[in-house]
Structure formats: structure tokens, C-alpha cells
Regions:
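Bacterial N-terminal signal peptides that target proteins for export
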Residues: 1-8
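N-terminal mature ectodomain segment of secretory-pathway/periplasmic proteins
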Residues: 23-96, 126-134, 140-155, 162, ...
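Signal peptide-directed extracytoplasmic domains
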Residues: 109-110, 118, 123
Length: 279
């Protein structure tokens, strides 16, 4: 769980592409099939997650048992770190910390946010561009770019298994086309044998639910940004106090369904100096 705090955070963009409507429609349909396959099939993925912080080796298993989702994300190297999804409960297990449970629909840790996006919503601000086929993990894949039309956000490239539509690789790119993060499958398995291997998790006792504090006092602010990127809407607003600030901080959280950012305002005083906090 990460809280985004910034004075203003703008999302960098990428190259723009011109494509015809039929190409966008078919690519969008493939992405929607990826979303459905990721949440309905019984499968196991061994993958690496690469970012500026380093490389992680992980295994993700997903199944549907008794008409509810069951998933496990396991770190394969170093200390055992595990995340378990059962129904709408997500439990975290990590050495040195008490295990706890939160409410949620799917595991997002180390998995690309693109997989669970609402592509019908994203189609209002993004182009979905087919760039051909290639092989990943010895599987033929459809390759699709996801690019914001106004050039204000990062872009994605997704490699979808041509048969199952599961994501086998997803790259997050900056505006210069440099890879910031990469999710890359090295082996995977699809079938009922995956659900059979997870039956013990379905019966396991999960840790207690963590009490999550309220997001702050609800408030109607007398300020608002004069410009927002296309497709971005306000998700929530709150007011709270932070140790490093005098007086309350007013916060608005925005999202386009794929990327999120917040704008936080604190009333200036005579001793205040200009500062920009960026996340």
C-alpha cells in the first residue's frame, strides 16, 4: 500500500501513433480478453519483475474454486514473502511482520496494473495499437501498445499469449521509450491441475482483518485545477494533518483508470518558502 503525496505530479507521455478505428477496436478487444482470462482461468506463472529497484523472481497462481477467486503470489528468492487472495480478502505474510488481511478484488503487488484495467474506459483517452506477433516463453504472442493520445502519460507494451490471452510480458515505458518496469513470464501452466494444487489455500485460516483508518475529513474545497489530462477524473478528496506541515493539508486524488496522481495544498504562512514535492 503506497500513499501518493505531492504538490503536483504530472504523468509523462510517450510517442503518438496514428491508427485506424478497426485496428484500435481489435486490439482493445484483445486487451479486454486479457483482463477476462487473468481473472477466470486456472493458471500458474513464473516471472521476473524488473525495475529501478532491482530484479525479483516470483510465482503467481490463480484459480477459481467454489465460484470464487483464489490466488497466491510468492517471492521465490530470499526471505519468503507471500500474498494470498481468497474471495475479496487479500492476506500478506512477510518475515518480521505480523500477517494481516485487507479487502480487495485482486493482487496488484509486482503485477502490472494494466492487466486489471477497464479498457472501455481507457479507450476514451488511449490508443490500442497492434504491432504484430512475436514469441515469449516459447509461446506466440500478440503485441499491443497502449498510448495516451495527448502525450501526457507513460505508455505500455503488452505481449498476450495468442491462445489463452494471458499476459506474458508487460513493459512500462517513459516518454523517451526507455523501459521503467518490466513483467516477464519465463514459464507458465494452464489447467485444472493448478486449482487442485491450491485446495489447501482454500481451507487455510487467514490472518485477522486490518483496521484501516479513514482517509481524512471529507471536505469541499474552494480550489480545483484548471486543467487535467484527457480522461482523468477526481476519485476522492480529503483533509488531514501531517507532522511536517503547519495546518491541514487538502488533497485531491485523480485517476484515468490506469495512472493516478494527487494534488495536495497547504495554506502558506509568512515563514513558508516555495517548494515542490514530486512522487
Amino acid at each position: 500500500m503506497k500513499q501518493l503525496w505531492c504538490a503536483m505530479s504530472l504523468m509523462a507521455g510517450s510517442l503518438l501513433f496514428s491508427v485506424n478505428a478497426s485496428a484500435d477496436t481489435s486490439s482493445g478487444a484483445l486487451l479486454q480478453q486479457m483482463n477476462l482470462a487473468s481473472q477466470s482461468l486456472n493458471y500458474e506463472l513464473s516471472f521476473v519483475s524488473i525495475s529501478k529497484q532491482g530484479v525479483e523472481s516470483l510465482r503467481y497462481r490463480h484459480a477459481r474454486l467454489n465460484n470464487q477467486p483464489l490466488a497466491q503470489l510468492l517471492q521465490l528468492d530470499g526471505p519468503r514473502r507471500e500474498v494470498v487472495l481468497r474471495g475479496t480478502e487479500i492476506s500478506y505474510f512477510e518475515p518480521g511482520l505480523d500477517p494481516f488481511t485487507l479487502n480487495g478484488d485482486y493482487i496488484v503487488d509486482s503485477l502490472p496494473s494494466l492487466v486489471y484495467s477497464d479498457f472501455k474506459r481507457l479507450s476514451a483517452a488511449y490508443d490500442f495499437i497492434s504491432v504484430g506477433r512475436t514469441r515469449i516463453a516459447d509461446r506466440l504472442c500478440d503485441v499491443i501498445r497502449v498510448v495516451a493520445r495527448d502525450g501526457t502519460r507513460y505508455s505500455f507494451i503488452a505481449w498476450l499469449d495468442a491462445e489463452t490471452k494471458l499476459p506474458l510480458r508487460v513493459d512500462l515505458l517513459d516518454r523517451d521509450g526507455e523501459t521503467l518496469e518490466q513483467f516477464r513470464v519465463v514459464s507458465f501452466n494452464v489447467g485444472d491441475n493448478v486449482s487442485a494444487s491450491m485446495e489447501t489455500l482454500a481451507k487455510a485460516n487467514l490472518p485477522p482483518q486490518l483496521s484501516v483508518p479513514e482517509g481524512g475529513d471529507k471536505a469541499n474545497f474552494n480550489w480545483a485545477p484548471t486543467w487535467l489530462p484527457q480522461g482523468v477524473t477526481e476519485v476522492s478528496s480529503s483533509q488531514r494533518r501531517l507532522p511536517t506541515f503547519d495546518g491541514p493539508v487538502e488533497s485531491r486524488l485523480y485517476s484515468d483508470g490506469l495512472f493516478s496522481f494527487s494534488i495536495n495544498i497547504n495554506r502558506a504562512t509568512a515563514a513558508s518558502s516555495d517548494q515542490l514535492l514530486r512522487t
